[in-house]
Regions:
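Conserved small/polar residues in nucleotide/adenosyl-binding loops
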Residues: 1-5
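Short, contiguous clusters of charged residues that form electrostatic/catalytic patches at enzyme active sites
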Residues: 6, 55, 59, 138-142, ...
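Generic non-transmembrane alpha-helical segments
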Residues: 6-7, 37, 105-109
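Short, flexible coil/linker segments at domain boundaries that flank nucleotide/cofactor-interacting
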Residues: 8-14, 150-155
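Gly/Ala-rich phosphate-binding loop of Rossmann-like dinucleotide-binding domains
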Residues: 9, 39, 176
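Residue-level marker of positions within ordered structural domains that often coincide
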Residues: 9, 24, 62, 107, ...
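Ferredoxin-reductase
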Residues: 12-90
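Gly/Ser/Thr-enriched, mixed-charge loops and adjacent short helices
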Residues: 82-184
Length: 184
């Protein structure tokens, strides 16, 4: 029984999963491998073409009305670590019960090297793997801009400390679009 049947089809007959990745070593390649496995199982995958922040994944899952989301990250852990975080259709991390069920399924896999995964480019050609629409990123940016009007009104100085993380490009775009030239 595959992940689609065990977990995703319980949530939606035609499941869609959004996958994002951060700036860590091999995160993009890891995201593509997960996309290959899910798409091979018949899951529609929406894959970011470039690194994204975790809040962007949560937003994209809700915006696209996806069944689930996968974030390739090790969060605050050392840079040589990597891992995945799974999100539900509400854009939040899985609740303990759902997380435990998925963990049991994964732990029951006898030989991970025998998991079937078709060619990435073929799956893209067949549109089983699609790119994250730019409209989703633009909607996210607009949502953030709508929330930060108070900062703009008070001409506050902004200090951005993404520490080489994924939020730097989008945060800089948002601040520039809001007319901030007084940020570090």
């Amino acid at each position: 029984m595959c992940i689609r049947d065990r977990y995703l089809k319980q949530k939606n007959e035609h499941p869609t999963v959004v996958i994002h990745f951060d700036t860590r070593f091999l995160s993009q390649e890891f995201s593509q491998e997960i996309a290959r496995v899910l798409a091979t199982e018949g899951v529609s995958v929406v894959l970011a073409d470039t690194y994204k922040s975790t809040p962007e994944l949560s937003f994209a899952v809700r915006e696209l009305k996806a069944t689930a989301g996968v974030m390739i990250t090790a969060s605050h852990n050392p840079s040589h670590y990597n891992g995945i975080k799974i999100y539900g259709a509400d854009g939040g991390q899985l609740l303990p019960e759902a997380s435990e069920d998925l963990s049991q399924y994964i732990n029951a896999i006898e030989s991970p090297l025998e998991i079937e995964a078709r060619d990435f480019n073929s799956l893209k050609t067949e549109k089983l793997i699609t790119s994250l629409p730019t409209e989703v990123t633009e909607a996210y940016k607009q949502g953030v801009k709508d929330l930060v009007g108070v900062i703009e009104e008070n001409n506050a100085r902004v200090v951005l400390t993404s520490l080489h993380g994924t939020s730097l490009p989008i945060a800089a775009d948002i601040l520039t679009e809001l007319g901030f030239d007084n940020y570090v």
